Amino acid sequence: MNNLAETLNHLYQAAFLNDAADHKHICQAIVELANFVSQNQITLDEPTVEILARKINDFLEQCGHLLDVSEKYSIIRSVQQLYGKKRQKQFKILVPQLIKLFKSLASDNNLPEEIASNAYDWVFALCWQQMDNFHDTSLLIKENIVEPYSNYLDRIRFRPQTTTKISQSKKIKICYLIQHFSVSGSYANGRAIYSLLQGHFLNNSEDIEIYLYITGATEISLLPTVLSYNNVIVRNFENHSNSSEKLEKIRKVAEKDQIDILITEMYFSSNIKYLKSRLAPVQMYLSCGFIPLTIPEVDYYLLFNNLFDDARGCSRPR
């Protein structure tokens, strides 16, 4: 443990106490510090986290405009590593600077799509988890993270679109696409979609066919119940780890299934790309509290009654 502490102290001094270091050396030292903490699974105490967050923020305020694309991405990645699973509130100070870095990255048409997506997910998560005011944070994320990322995808022509149209000669096929199928904890989206599936089963219609596409982790105890619904077809894409491969697989399956209406519920970069790919002729965003996605590929919003007034105040649903 003493060796770990000594190494950590050495890396800290290299990052923040070397007066002769330029911004490139400081950036590299921050990256090495974050890698060391992550690889050794070190849990930093709150006073240390507060010092680190303040030092990184000071560095970005002074030198953020000097960083190149690789360095901006490395800093975002380093903060994500230091942030870890404890989600200490001391990192909130970094939100404005990380948003600046992300918007700068998203404005670069030559930025690799994987880097843009990773940076989007990391900055989004930090902003969301550090919120104080739900309404203001939602608006901040929509305008400064979601929309720049959506515009970036438009500029790089990320549009492997499906061109199917709703057929009048078959059942209407509705697909719920969910990242984490769970009803445990505070994950409202999973509970909402689970309730909708139950409703479809109990009110079985000969004119509607229901699909459930699961793209991430699944609460195993839910599957036997959902699989017993004779009018719900489940497709699990969890084992496709590569995001590009998963998108292509989902796109092909949706086209083969002839999905008419796609309903999704999350803001992950992958979900934005699913919508951008136009997996169905009609696409909807199901909101369990977050303000509506204002991207052209979302045709309708499904909002709970108690959320409608709040959402309308931010962005009027079409």
Show where each model-derived region lies:
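A short acidic, amphipathic alpha-helical/loop segment
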Residues: 249-252, 270-276, 297
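N-terminal subdomain of nucleotide-sugar transferases
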Residues: 1-223, 228-230
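Catalytic cores of nucleotide-enabled group-transfer and carboxylate-activating enzymes in metabolic
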Residues: 218, 227-228, 246-256
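Short acidic, S/G/P-rich loop/turn micro-motifs used as interaction or catalytic elements
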Residues: 181-185, 241-242, 268-270
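Active-site-proximal region of nucleotide-activated glycan assembly enzymes
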Residues: 126-148, 280-318
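A short, charged, and often flexible helix/loop element on the N-terminal side
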Residues: 231-246
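Short N-terminal targeting/anchoring amphipathic segment
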Residues: 254-268
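Short, surface-exposed basic-aromatic patches at helix termini and helix-loop junctions that form
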Residues: 225-230, 274-281
